[in-house]
Amino acid sequence: QVLVYDAQGNLCAQANDVALSVPQLAQVAVPAPAKVPAAAQPVGDVRAQIGALLTQIIGVACADPDPDRGFFELGLSSISLVEFKRMLERQFALKLSATVGFDYPTINRLGQYLEGLLSREPASTPVTVDAGAPDAAGSVAVVAMACRFPQADSPEALWKLMLEQTDTVGPVPPSRLAGAKPEETFPRFASLIHRPEGFDEAFFRISPKEARSMDPQQRLLLMVAWEALERAGIPQEKLLEQRVGVFVGANSHDYETRVLGSAQGVDAHYGTGSSFSAICGRLSHFLGVRGPSLTVDTACSSSLTAIHLACNSLRAAECDIAIVGGVNVIASASIFQSMGQAGALAPDGISKAFDDSADGYGRGEGCGVVILKRQAQAERERDPIVATILGSAVNHDGACAGLTVPNGPAQEALISEALANAGVHPGQVSYVEAHGTGTVLGDPIELNALHNAYRQASPDSPPLTVASVKANIGHLEAAAGIASLIKACLVVEHGRIAPQAHLQRANTRVDWAAMNLKLAHQAMDWPGRPESRVAGVSAFGFTGTNVHVLLKGYTAPATAPLPPATAPVALCLSAATPAALAELAQRYVSFLGATEHCPQTICYNALVRRTAFKERLVVHGQDCRELAQALQAWLAGSPIANDRKPAAGEPWATL
């Protein structure tokens, strides 16, 4: 449907069933705006002159404008932008489009555009867009992972937590239970992250007032997605205006409920602050990317559905990089009240998946993000591939016993479809990270479906090992699928299956003797080359949407090792603030003491594959040990390192 409006906003015409065909080859001649003839070209730095004009029109509040901050964020309005355009025309003797301030919305981008015009290049410059090549059957590479889960602020911390079976459940503080009455009875235990309200709004170019109105799920996603991109070695400037997709699963309306019930009520930022579309849209806007941007809500399968959609988008060449994740923050009592009345919650807050004492699921919160690329592209660009996604499938329970009742045959059909899409035989799969919520009804249904789909077709195969991360960090609801995927990636990467937490006695409602399945009562080695380790991941939404993903480990092609450095190498670090730089240096000290990478590679990545900030530090050394010693010496003599007072909510060094 196409709607046409006039300048006053009145609907003039409407067209339905319009089809648009776009050719794959996109080489377009873009005419430059006409120059005003016989006018003298200005001298001096173009961007400095733009900044000076901004200061004139906005005032002293914009005396030193950030060249990468949007004009509206700096204080211009749609009305003042018109005057700004006229000032630019007078200053640079150019005839500019009325939309120039919208098309090039920062000093740097506008400056680059005007510099091109002033260089008297040809009026038409061909712009080639690499549309990529669809690859329906291609594998998708996981090139980076980042997370903020209960007591695990990184994938490495999550792996350690699972091996040690750390208990993450605790009482929910009253500040998280907005709307609850003291006399109400419902389970008040959950697995929570530390200070979800912490946020460095200045880093993300957001005003303090707007940040307060933002759902913490938006804030948390921004931070974790940034860390994932840093881990992938993709600087922000490489993403600008590129086909980068953002796919995120989210389901909680807690913050909206909290705002509507507060004395302050709604403000001008409530719309974007509480909108699900803004969860992805804000990240795409901050990064300046132009790929698909979709917030997905299929309840507990939301983030794994986002993985499925992102992989299909990459294979169809709709995007070249996909930022995929899930987020869930507990900010009110509403779900505790509802699920408590339904009898779905474990009284002690623990998801005792597959155990005989299973009595409901324990709630959890957090955020996980992965960076995906087509495998061929990731290998070509020498990205650090963690695992490869072979295929996936999504379906619905259909007409079953009830809207929220799992459907075993539907789960079997789902797994069979995923296997076919991935080109994998059931016997090749040795491990499944199950949905496994610890409910009386759900666990036996899922285990039976896993046996039927994976081992009836290959009865001579070894038992299929089944596990669930929900017993470690709780059921993260919309973010549960991404947590399961990250765990599965760690399992195939390390070749080791973590023990199933809170497993005392296998569920006696399950006929284990008739099933070719087993549980990890203790840590188990998974021998063989990484690419031989094939795992499945399941997520089921409580309204019937089911997803299954198949992935395997990855071995990078052998390359000749770099010769030992014959001269000192320079390690260049940068961060947005002095405190963050000190924290980053400390993290590098720990990293350099444990890494097996050569110092040349580390220094190259730090310089070329990280976003550069204004606070810089350079140290040199012959090897990793000397680099770490140089950083320690700087930290010992740095006032900010010795007396660090980080900003509130500053959780990552890169922020």
Positions of predicted regions on the chain:
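C-terminal active-site-capping segments
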Residues: 1-33
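Short, low-complexity connector segments at domain boundaries
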Residues: 3-6, 102-150, 181-183, 197, ...
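Conserved S/T- and glycine-rich ATP-binding loop of Class I adenylate-forming
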Residues: 9, 88, 429
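C-terminal catalytic ATP-binding subdomain
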Residues: 17, 114-119, 547-555
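Phosphopantetheine-dependent thiolation modules in NRPS/PKS and related acyl-activating systems
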Residues: 22-33, 44-131, 512
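Condensing-enzyme catalytic core of the thiolase-fold
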Residues: 137-564, 583, 590, 594, ...
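Short glycine-/aliphatic-rich beta-strand segments at the starts of folded cytosolic domains
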Residues: 567-574
